[in-house]
Curated annotation (Swiss-Prot):
Gene3D superfamilies: Leucyl/phenylalanyl-tRNA-protein transferase, C-terminal domain, Leucyl/phenylalanyl-tRNA-protein transferase, N-terminal domain. It catalyses: N-terminal L-lysyl-[protein] + L-leucyl-tRNA(Leu) = N-terminal L-leucyl-L-lysyl-[protein] + tRNA(Leu) + H(+); N-terminal L-arginyl-[protein] + L-leucyl-tRNA(Leu) = N-terminal L-leucyl-L-arginyl-[protein] + tRNA(Leu) + H(+); L-phenylalanyl-tRNA(Phe) + an N-terminal L-alpha-aminoacyl-[protein] = an N-terminal L-phenylalanyl-L-alpha-aminoacyl-[protein] + tRNA(Phe). Its EC number is 2.3.2.6. GO terms for molecular function: leucyl-tRNA--protein transferase activity. One of its GO terms (biological process) is protein catabolic process. It holds the Pfam family Leu_Phe_trans. It is found in: Cytoplasm. NCBIfam families: aat (TIGR00667). The gene is aat. The keyword Membrane does not apply. The keyword Acyltransferase applies. This is Leucyl/phenylalanyl-tRNA--protein transferase. Keywords: Acyltransferase, Cytoplasm, Transferase.
């Protein structure tokens, strides 16, 4: 199948036309309207500094039902000890920059380019991209960020500078998302790390159907507060 070159307007081809590896289209920009259109259609950007903007819709898709969250026993002990304090939207830009700096086994460089950082900071200022932070005292020990639309949360990346910090942030974030009415967490592609927490692969068509239902719900827009579920302030 051909790889589509995006037009100037924020429109995308049918995800069913993606390559076997999930690559769907190339080009366009990272303006908020295009990013939000992409997420609403089950498409996300992923590229490195040496590549043009690439857009993906893999099949199968990894997702987590917040109600199906599994917490490994060893992590349950860490949570009970209260080693880390978890917050939301307290340090978004610091979180995304640490995710960009994180070394990943078998990967040279980062896909979170300066252009990507700027794009998601813009979404954060619009109240549509959010971070969860794990703190060890006053030190940022780990965290994650993603995008919220309707009753869906699209996880993007996480980092840890201390043992289990990102795992604690992830568990607390999913617990909060569930209490706030979020129906699915998009984990994009399979990793054994996320499978251990209850994520599972589903056919792209099933993911898109569930996403469409989730988008019928209102978006939790604004600054989130972890201490209280429901609509943010």
């Amino acid at each position: 199948m051909p790889i589509f070159r995006l037009p100037r307007e924020p429109a995308f081809p049918d995800p069913a036309l993606a390559e076997p590896d999930g690559l769907l289209a190339v080009g366009g920009d990272l303006e908020p309207e295009r990013l939000l259109t992409a997420y609403a259609e089950g498409i996300f950007p992923w590229f490195d500094a040496e590549s043009p903007i690439l857009w993906w819709s893999p099949d199968p898709r990894l997702l987590l039902d917040p109600a199906a969250l599994h917490v490994p026993r060893s992590l349950q002990r860490t949570l009970r000890r209260g080693t880390y304090r978890v917050s939301a939207d307290q340090a978004f830009e610091r979180v995304i920059r640490r995710c960009a700096e994180r070394d990943r086994p078998g990967q040279q460089g980062t896909w979170i380019t300066a252009e990507m950082v700027e794009a998601y900071v813009r979404l954060h200022r619009l109240g549509l991209a959010h971070s969860f932070e794990a703190w060890d005292g006053d030190a940022l020990a780990g965290g994650l960020y993603g995008v919220s639309l309707g009753a869906a949360f699209f996880g993007e990346s996480m980092f840890a500078d201390a043992p289990d910090a990102s795992k604690v942030a992830f568990v607390r974030s999913v617990e909060w998302l569930r209490s706030a009415g979020v129906e699915l967490v998009d984990c994009q592609v399979r990793t054994e790390h996320l499978v251990r927490f209850g994520a599972r692969e589903v056919p792209r068509a099933e993911f898109l159907a569930r996403l469409a239902r989730a988008l019928e719900q209102p978006t939790l827009r604004g600054r989130w507060q972890l201490e209280a579920a429901g609509p943010p302030s």
